[in-house]
Swiss-Prot record:
Coiled coil: none annotated. This is Acetyl-coenzyme A carboxylase carboxyl transferase subunit beta. HAMAP family: AcetylCoA_CT_beta. Pathway: Lipid metabolism; malonyl-CoA biosynthesis; malonyl-CoA from acetyl-CoA: step 1/1. Component of the acetyl coenzyme A carboxylase (ACC) complex. Biotin carboxylase (BC) catalyzes the carboxylation of biotin on its carrier protein (BCCP) and then the CO(2) group is transferred by the transcarboxylase to acetyl-CoA to form malonyl-CoA. Binds 1 zinc ion per subunit. The keyword Phosphoprotein does not apply. It catalyses: N(6)-carboxybiotinyl-L-lysyl-[protein] + acetyl-CoA = N(6)-biotinyl-L-lysyl-[protein] + malonyl-CoA. A zinc finger (C4-type) spans 38-59.
């Protein structure tokens, strides 16, 4: 038997079962749906204070909104006619888990795909409209997204309509491989045909607009608007910094930075977009 015992390195604490079971029993739970945290100023906001436009009352940050919410804010009530709802992804590569991911996105958003397309009236001006929804697999551009937008431009040519697109995307949809990348050229060709017909094309960049969407139809509008502080770019910030071996400005890839460097024509508050769209469409010949 040893005469000496090695000194304990740590203090031993016996659990106090009384304290363990007595904490927070009478503290009321606050439902998550009552409050939202602003990503910009970090303030907790009572959701009713965000309003229909979902703008932070403290710093004016524009929260990301769904395609249906965008539709309500933009078009004349009851005027929207949805188009191309029968087109569905066939999972050409049989990518593992892709069908399950699509189904979950459909159930969560109520959309068939990452873009809502159709015809609508904005203050009496008829337009062909597309709204991308970042809640649907980050609004990544796959074959169906590309096909729906292409058909929208073709319809606009036939009916002599201006096209308005709200862009939001994480880029090409990796689950569809090279076929998703082909949509960049496909949609761009449709944009060109629409332009050759002398028709007006307006893009509104929303947070986030990145990857192949930025590299194609998002930046091909006759006029390019953007919501305040929207993230707009192609590659990610860290990828660019690693490639060029330079530190980029803090506001790099923000809408304001792009406007200062000539890539965006104007930054428009979300609450003013409806009036701005109607004015620009009417000025460029209208959609009667």
């Amino acid at each position: 038997m040893a005469l000496f015992r090695k000194k304990d390195k740590y203090i031993r604490i016996t659990p106090n079962n009384f304290l363990k079971g007595s904490v927070s029993h009478n503290v009321p739970e606050v439902p998550d749906e009552l409050f939202a945290k602003c990503p910009a100023c970090k303030h907790m906001i009572y959701k009713k204070d965000l309003g229909l436009a979902k703008i932070c009352p403290t710093c004016s940050y524009n929260f990301r909104i769904s395609a249906q919410e965008r539709l309500t804010l933009t078009v004349d009530e009851g005027s929207f006619q949805e188009l191309f709802t029968s087109i569905e992804t066939k999972d050409p590569l049989r990518f593992p888990g892709y069908q399950e991911k699509l189904q979950k996105a459909k159930e969560t958003t109520g959309l068939h795909e990452a873009v809502l397309t159709g015809k609508a009236m904005v203050k009496g001006q008829q337009i062909a409209l597309a709204i991308m929804d970042s809640h649907f697999i980050m609004a990544s551009m796959g074959t169906v997204v590309g096909e729906k937008i292409t058909r929208l431009f073709e319809l606009a040519i036939e009916e002599n309509l201006p096209v308005v697109i709200f862009t939001a995307s994480g880029g090409a949809r990796m689950q569809e491989g090279i076929m998703s990348l082909m949509q960049m050229a496909k949609v761009s060709a449709a944009v060109k045909r629409h332009s050759n017909a002398g028709l007006f094309y307006l893009t509104i960049l929303t947070d986030p607009t990145t990857g192949g969407v930025t590299a194609s139809f998002a930046m091909e509008g006759d006029i390019i608007l953007a919501e305040p502080q929207s993230l707009v770019g192609f590659a990610g910030r860290r990828v660019i910094e690693t490639t060029v071996r330079e530190n980029l400005p803090d506001d790099f890839q923000k809408a304001e930075f792009l406007q200062d460097h000539g890539f965006v024509d104007a930054i428009v508050k979300r609450t003013e977009l409806r009036d701005k769209i109607a004015h620009l469409v009417a000025f460029h010949g209208g959609g009667q």
